[in-house]
């Protein structure tokens, strides 16, 4: 993916995407505690909504407001572990938006975390709070939480 120089004139730079496929303005305007998006394939649910809005909200909340990434099957999660945030990492948006503080997102034990890699792809710093949690509906009985 080509790196993009983001600035105030870059189209859609707030969301890290040059695509104008934004189907979630109505959902975000509700300011609900839980937003659920259901729709047909390839209509802009995951990429702009989860990836950019979720990561952006996490960063803007001083790294406290994580989000849940829910799929129907755990096999769907396994396929997305590496690629889910590839768009905001590969084009340089994450580094730009955090002013160089973070430039990568990695998956570990059902959670995604921010981290900074150096030019040799060695880890310099890791975020302790996860940016997102992974859940599969078919595994819901295995999850633990408060009663």
Where are these regions (language model features)?
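Pre-Walker A adenine-sensing motif
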Residues: 1-33
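Short hydrophobic/aromatic beta-strand immediately N-terminal to the Walker A/P-loop
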Residues: 33-38, 68
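Inter-Walker segment of RecA-like/P-loop motor cores
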Residues: 84-145
């Amino acid at each position: 993916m080509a790196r993009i120089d983001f600035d105030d004139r870059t189209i859609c730079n707030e969301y890290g995407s040059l695509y104008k496929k934004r189907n979630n303005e109505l959902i975000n305007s509700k300011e609900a505690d839980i937003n659920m998006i259901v729709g047909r394939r390839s209509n802009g649910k995951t990429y702009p909504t989860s990836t950019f809005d979720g990561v952006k909200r996490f960063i803007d909340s001083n790294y406290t407001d994580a989000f849940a990434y829910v799929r129907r099957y755990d096999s769907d999660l396994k396929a997305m572990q590496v690629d889910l945030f590839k768009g905001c990492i590969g084009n340089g948006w994450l580094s730009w938006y955090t002013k160089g503080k973070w430039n990568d997102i990695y998956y570990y034990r059902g959670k995604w975390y921010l981290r900074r890699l150096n030019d040799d792809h060695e880890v310099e710093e890791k975020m302790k709070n996860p940016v997102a949690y992974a859940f599969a509906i078919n595994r819901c009985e295995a999850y633990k939480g408060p009663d």
